[in-house]
């Protein structure tokens, strides 16, 4: 009997209030790194109706206009009218940054030399994951959820659906048979809209213009349940509808619940914070394992102690799909990847102003030129060392 089950993931648009906060935090991080790549940044953002609060810890030589960066980010997202929930021109922006605690800094302040034994900025555990469900080696439900809200934003920006507004959420339920995607079961899409659009017209346009062009044709089997703005009216949105906070969409940012999460958010954090850099490294490791043909699914856990460079643990789980044992793969990971914090920064070239782009539509599974953790440049070496044939996805 086939193992038949449903699995669901969600995403949110760049105009969702929590994502507004994430993008402001990462825009500030990028501006700082452009001037001082060795800065220590933990930039948190709160946004509500007409108000943005910037707080956290920043130690830098950079001279940054934080208020203008916040306004520019809100404008780029599309909040240029008070009717949308916040207006970049008129919102209040409060700045309350402190410097990094010297107790923390003493363990990580070797950033300017070539010593790769810079300690981790905190303790913690991080996960990386990859699977062969999509060419990008991502779980299908989160991949499709991201593409839906990306398309919503695209149609809003180019004016094809002029009544769309920045805030939106998506959710995709996929039916799996024997562990493989079989068909799309349910698609939910809720989008903020202008007050004068009638609900039937909105639903028809969303289904025909956003949802159907996004779904893979080979997974459209039978009747799919389309739930578009299922509560009806969605005029009040963005930071007016809900208070936005940095770091509240950590499952959207990663694998949509298909893999565990260590709990640490990404946005606003410089790469000395292993919450971010080690999660990126975990994705890099897992993706190369799958691309190498060592397994069709790979989960990596890595953990750290504050002030200590070497990971306290490295674990690989291939869920029985490995062509060699998990112990062998773990040994290969330790041999081919430097998972010390500064080793990760060097390996993935993370001292660059590349982070605002990560803050909406997922940190993983997007083959952007800046996203070094999506490369599969270690796959051939892993395959050769393990004695297996790599997949066709090696790049």
Swiss-Prot record:
UniProt-annotated location(s): Cytoplasm
Residues that hold L-methionine according to the record: 57, 100, 242, 273
Alphabetized UniProt keyword annotations: ATP-binding, Cytoplasm, Magnesium, Metal-binding, Nucleotide-binding, One-carbon metabolism, Potassium, Transferase
An example Gene Ontology CC term for this record: cytoplasm
PROSITE patterns the record matches: ADOMET_SYNTHASE_1, ADOMET_SYNTHASE_2
Source taxon at top rank: Bacteria
Name of this chain's protein: S-adenosylmethionine synthase
Phylogenetic lineage: Bacteria, Pseudomonadati, Pseudomonadota, Betaproteobacteria, Burkholderiales
Encoding gene (name): metK
């Amino acid at each position: 009997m086939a193992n038949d089950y449903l699995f669901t993931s969600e995403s949110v648009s760049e105009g969702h209030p929590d994502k507004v906060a994430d993008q402001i935090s990462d825009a500030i991080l990028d501006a700082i790194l452009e001037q001082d790549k060795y800065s220590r940044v933990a930039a948190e953002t709160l946004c509500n109706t007409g108000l943005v609060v910037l707080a956290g810890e920043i130690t830098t030589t950079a001279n940054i206009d934080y208020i203008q960066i916040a306004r520019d980010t809100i404008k780029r997202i599309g909040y240029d009218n008070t009717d949308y929930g916040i207006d970049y021109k008129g919102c209040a922006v409060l700045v309350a940054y402190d410097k990094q605690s010297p107790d923390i800094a003493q363990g990580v302040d070797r950033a300017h030399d070539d010593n790769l034994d810079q300690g981790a900025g905190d303790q913690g555990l991080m996960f990386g994951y990859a699977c062969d469900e999509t060419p990008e080696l991502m779980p299908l439900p989160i991949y499709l959820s991201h593409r839906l809200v990306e398309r919503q934003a695209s149609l809003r920006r180019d004016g094809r659906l002029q009544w769309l507004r920045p805030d939106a959420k998506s959710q995709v339920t996929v039916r799996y048979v024997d562990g493989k995607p079989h068909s799309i079961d349910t698609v939910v899409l809720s989008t903020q809209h202008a007050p004068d659009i009638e609900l039937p017209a909105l639903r028809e346009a969303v289904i025909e213009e956003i949802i159907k062009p996004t779904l893979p044709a080979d997974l459209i089997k039978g009747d799919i349940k389309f739930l578009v703005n299922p509560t009806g009216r969605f005029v009040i949105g963005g930071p007016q509808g809900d208070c936005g906070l940095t770091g509240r969409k950590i499952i959207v940012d990663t694998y949509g619940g298909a893999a565990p999460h260590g709990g640490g958010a990404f946005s606003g954090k410089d790469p000395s914070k292993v919450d971010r850099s080690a999660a990126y490294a975990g994705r890099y490791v897992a993706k190369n394992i799958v691309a190498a043909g060592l397994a069709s699914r790979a989960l990596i856990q890595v953990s750290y102690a504050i002030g200590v460079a070497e990971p306290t643990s490295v674990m690989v789980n291939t869920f029985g799909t490995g062509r060699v044992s998990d112990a062998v793969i773990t040994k290969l990971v330790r041999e081919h990847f430097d998972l010390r914090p500064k080793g990760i920064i060097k390996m993935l070239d993370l001292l660059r102003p590349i982070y605002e782009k990560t803050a909406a539509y997922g940190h993983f599974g997007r083959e952007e030129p800046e996203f070094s953790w999506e490369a599969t440049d270690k796959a051939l070496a892993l395959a050769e060392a393990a004695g297996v044939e790599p997949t066709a996805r090696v790049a």
